[in-house]
Amino acid sequence: MSNTNYVILTVASVDFSYRETMARLMSSYSKDLIDNAGAKGTRFGSIGTGDHAGSLIFIQFYDDLTGYQKALEIQSKSSVFKEIMDSGKANIYLRNISTSLPTKFEQSSEHPKYIVLTRAEAAMSDKDKFLNCINDTAFCFKDNGALTLRFGNLLTGSNVGNYLLGVGYPSMEAIEKTYDQLLAHSSYKELMTFAKVNMRNIIKIL
């Protein structure tokens, strides 16, 4: 998937017995968004760690927010979305919009099996410095198997202004190797002097 400018993240609690059905329905819903709202891609997965462990997350990628506006119009008329909501087994409790800034990371077209979402607090005046650190360490992600990387700022929610890094991986082993190398990198150490990580979750793509 190519670079995009906006990422939409929606989190829901879902009855375990309904997950297989919801995964099937979300596949159909995703196709509708790509075909008719201009979504550049979607991801659907289960959050395995952190405060939202056990919840499901739906991630959408857009070039502009006009696409997301179209997505909301489709949502209001979608029989698939209505079926999910009418089931009484899924409850959306979080939806945030994040920017996605250009980075030096070359995106792969291969679909990841895992995504690591990291949220950090830092001053807006440190945005360029933060982005430089991400670009300086981009090879650490790529060399250890990372497939996709998105970095930006949250525009909505209780953590507005926080920075969000989402990285897609083919395996848990690739995640482990990446962080082993990152911890020893000077730019990562610099990053930790002005940014405070307040969330890191691992998502398994369904």
Task: Outline where the language-model segments fall.
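Short S/T/G/P-rich N-terminal loop/turn motif that feeds into the first structured element of a domain
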Residues: 1-206
